[in-house]
Amino acid sequence: PDQSLYAYDSVPTMVRRINNTFKRADEIQWSRGINPGDEGFIDYFLPIVADAEAGFGGVLNAFELMKNMIAAGAAGVHFEDQLAAAKKCGHMGGKVLVPTREAVEKLISARFAADVMGVPTLILARTDAEAANLITSDYDENDKPFLTGERTQEGFFRVKNGLEQSISRGVAYAPYADLVWCETGVPDIGFAREFAQAVLAACPGKLLSYNCSPSFNWKKNLNDSQIASFQEELSALGYKYQFITLAGIHVNWFNTFKFAHAYARGEGMKHYVEMVQEPEFAAREMGYTFVSHQQEVGTGYFDDVTTVIQGGSSSVKALTGSTEEEQFH
């Protein structure tokens, strides 16, 4: 579950793996003689935005985590203002905020880490104050207007969650981050507008982020027309970085489920051909290349490396005589 229940270095490790994949794709392209400026050249080194959660501890943890993210190749990193020890997905209950000042200090830690590394890196500040109704401490003047006077059995203070608390934190974070993001429970243009207007009034030109989350039931909240125009309306309000968390995994799981369900009904390979292979062939004209999966992962590239090492010819090249060479070209 999305509760920081994994090792501190898990995300930097994943960023490194993604960047290694980009490097391999670029190497394969280069080995084919395709260079920048050539027709068909693809810049594979897309910017990676990495999730630092709540920093996995205090300011020093955030500092070291940011350094590791940068070393792994992250172009942007986002930090949220929850208590790291009780961190939850933004669409779960039981979220506990840290004081505004503590969250700001983690953003300062991240910026300092980027300065120390000498690498320009985007910092995204996320607040969970729209839904979070608990906070660890009552000392911060920025948080006092939202305290209810109640405490929980764990000793946390209850706060009034919602738009005003979100604005208070978004405005506080804006000077210390390149982008500001407020996690919300529903796709609400009205909420997004008020948050954006308040942050931009305090910090003109600040870029905003928005999570178009699959945790929203989109059709329960908006009609088809509203869904179709939602992201353009967000952009007009200043939300220049919009993303769908977990889009890829939902696509993978759903389509794998559909195929497995069809396959299990009988005539197994018929469904693979109709649902996967033939659509893959048809998608080639749009630029799809994974039909030739051996070539995609670098087999041809390593054949070239083998040929060079062996003086210009080799009898052990992998693609030569393969089913991929014979049937997919």
Residue spans for each PLM region:
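Alpha/beta enzyme core
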Residues: 1-243, 257, 261, 299-329
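Substrate-binding cleft of secreted/luminal carbohydrate-active enzymes
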Residues: 232-261, 267-299, 303
